[in-house]
A protein has these predicted regions:
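Acidic/histidine-rich catalytic cores and adjacent linkers
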Residues: 24, 115-153, 157-237
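Compositionally biased, low-structure terminal segments
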Residues: 3-4, 80, 181
Length: 237
């Protein structure tokens, strides 16, 4: 009957939850071992590369405890690293990353960055990486990398997402996006300022100006990452 089915379903869910917990614990142990190796200068990574591309993002997840009761949302930090793109597959119109490795966790930012650096050291000779290019969504925790010389770029997808979410006028969206795509950050910020002022309204329900200023503040806060490295005159091997 239905009560029996629900009971079996609950048992199955608990079993899956337990398996996932054990798997997570094992992965965490491996990550901690890599951190210890890094601090002891015994990391396994030997490969030397001219450039390492890194991407970091935060994803907010709805959480449940073992009894499937709702818990407050937590941010899962996601890190992806790769050496570049497969030239042959690019010619065929397919994008494929070379040497892609991922890491994810719910730790505090300091601990996550420690595991992230250990993940890099497990695969590469970190001291011999010529340049590190870091793409991120602008989250505050992303600005805490081990390598202060990493070049930061604001992730284009998140910029487009912010423009669409904060600017209601389609024409203004296109103008802002075009200024961003053509590498004109100063003109873009000025345009948003003018737009935000032009849509001010005495109607408290009209949030157009407020949202435009929020977009401005987001981009201004991440000003250093608005231009991709190649448009800054930075050459990498």
């Amino acid at each position: 009957d239905s009560s029996t089915s629900r009971g079996l379903g609950d048992v199955y869910k608990r079993q899956v939850w337990n398996v996932m917990q054990r798997l997570g614990e094992r992965i965490s142990e491996e990550e901690e071992h890599a951190v210890k190796q890094m601090h002891a200068d015994q990391s396994e990574g030997k490969k030397e590369i001219p450039v390492l591309f890194e991407e970091m993002d935060g994803v907010w997840l709805s959480m449940q405890d073992e009894q499937h009761k709702k818990m407050k949302k937590q941010e899962m930090k996601v890190f992806t690293m790769y050496e570049g793109w497969d030239a042959e597959k690019e010619k065929q119109g397919r994008s494929s990353l070379v040497g892609k490795t991922m890491l994810a966790g719910m730790e505090k930012s300091k601990k996550f960055h420690e595991k992230r650096e250990a993940c890099i050291c497990k695969k590469y000779d970190a001291d011999e990486i010529g340049q590190r290019i870091l793409n991120g969504d602008g989250g505050s925790w992303i600005y805490e990398p081990y390598d202060p010389e990493a070049i930061f770029q604001l992730d284009r997808y998140h910029v487009y997402q912010e423009i669409t979410g904060k600017i209601r006028d389609k024409k203004a969206q296109r103008e802002i996006r075009e200024l961003f795509d053509t590498g004109k950050p100063e003109e873009m910020l000025e345009y948003i300022q003018i737009y935000a002022t032009s849509v001010e309204s005495p109607d408290e329900k009209d949030k157009s100006s407020q949202k435009a200023w929020e977009l401005y503040q987001y981009l201004e806060h991440n000003r250093e990452g608005l231009l991709p490295y190649d448009k800054r005159g930075i050459k990498i091997a």
